[in-house]
Curated annotation (Swiss-Prot):
Keywords: Antibiotic resistance, Lyase, Magnesium, Metal-binding. Inactivates the type B streptogramin antibiotics by linearizing the lactone ring at the ester linkage, generating a free phenylglycine carboxylate and converting the threonyl moiety into 2-amino-butenoic acid. It is an enzyme of class 4 (lyase). This is Virginiamycin B lyase. Its EC number is 4.2.99.-. Coiled coil: none annotated. It comes from the Bacteria. GO terms for cellular component: outer membrane-bounded periplasmic space. The keyword Metal-binding applies. The active site is at H269 (proton acceptor). Its cofactor is Mg(2+). One of its GO terms (biological process) is antibiotic catabolic process. It comes from Bacillus licheniformis (strain ATCC 14580 / DSM 13 / JCM 2505 / CCUG 7422 / NBRC 12200 / NCIMB 9375 / NCTC 10341 / NRRL NRS-1264 / Gibson 46). Mg(2+) binds at E267, E284.
Amino acid sequence: MQIRMTEYQVPDPESGPYGITVCANGRIWFTEQKGNRIGMLTESGDITEYTIPTESAGASIITSGIDGELWFTEYKAGKIGKITPQGKITEYALPPGAAPFGIAAGCDDAMWYTDMAGHQIGRLSSSGEITEYKLPKPGAFPSFITRGADGALWFTQNQSGSIGRITADGDISEYPLPQEQSGPVGITAGPDGALWFTEINANQIGRITVSGKISEYQLPTAHARPHAIAAGGDGALWFTEWGAGQIGRITVDGDITEYPIPTADSEPHGIAAGSAHSIWFAEECGRIGKISIQN
């Protein structure tokens, strides 16, 4: 398989692009963690930016909601943000002390998020009502969250070295990983019905079935520090290697390929699938990257 990699410079090179998602209309939305903005990139490379009302909000993960709008976390401000396709931003304040990070749409028309500081999973209803669910173990540091094929929300617990699952009713299950200090971060639903996740400390990609069976795959590059992961339209999983400045691809059979990013010290974080032949990723160095898959 051949690929072509393209990079787009954001207006402020110090803005720190972090999270990224692709809308149904093909437009790419991303957070600027240091620039305190939400950016929108068209397929032709034009970028529009929208300033977040709260200063130094710490915008992190962004995702599409069931309502067609974009939802993002503000971990420093303790808020959940929503932005319309036209750029109108609404913020929802969480209970004091919250530090939301991961966010995903559930099957119940609500947005679910992880609270790293409160060690809990939160639910924000379409009417703005907030419900919180404490995790069994304190200090778990829940990170990314995604909806699984079973309708539940699955999330990584970075400090406890485990994968968590929560139902729409708030029932929580935990699945310890073989290495307690593996540091799981990103997680996504795979094309095989399983959940795939990154292990930033163990330098591995993990897979867990909805019944809890775990498999792990070691990365070829040492100290790659895999971060985010997304299911591509080509039937494989794509992930960022924050420490190595590479984008990785793993098939459902566990075959891994790595692609170096042209820009040095790119520090890739978020990643998302576009069309069947494109993958987009955010580089903290001030760029948005695109992989075009050429069969």
